[in-house]
């Protein structure tokens, strides 16, 4: 089951889906399969700029060993890749995400990013800002209403920098 994050950030990443609907679908799946079928399921997510600050919460919500964090789906040059994440957010995520089979590759990637940290260039920030502005305009929403505080502040500061 693909899920990237909990709460309002889920609603931003998975627009137009609602977090409450996700919970309802999981409850339905559990009620249908409980004791009747031998069906097991796990969760997968794609770590990215928008959700890295929230992954520890997601992991605790779903169970660390039921969540596989696939960090290879966003190319490094993508505006939403982990290479765009500020150092302090990476450090916090590293402390917050539990080390287990489903997160070991991500944790090693974060450690590598921190060891070789280079802040995003102005050109990268411009691409990120433009992409977020296009998303928000198209969806008639605003990132400030959905994303976690440090990520939201980083985007706001980036908008100021490139304007």
Residue ranges and their predicted role:
Residues 3-6, 32, 39, 46, ...:
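Extended aliphatic helical segments
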Residues 98:
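Acidic metal-coordinating catalytic centers involved in nucleic-acid phosphodiester chemistry
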Residues 1-72, 89:
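Radical SAM/AdoMet-radical enzyme domain recognition
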Residues 47-53, 66-95, 106-110, 115, ...:
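Flexible glycine/acidic-rich beta-alpha junction loops that bind and position SAM and/or redox cofactors
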Residues 101-163:
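Radical SAM enzyme core and accessory elements
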Residues 12, 24, 45, 70, ...:
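Intrinsically disordered, low-complexity regions enriched in small/polar residues
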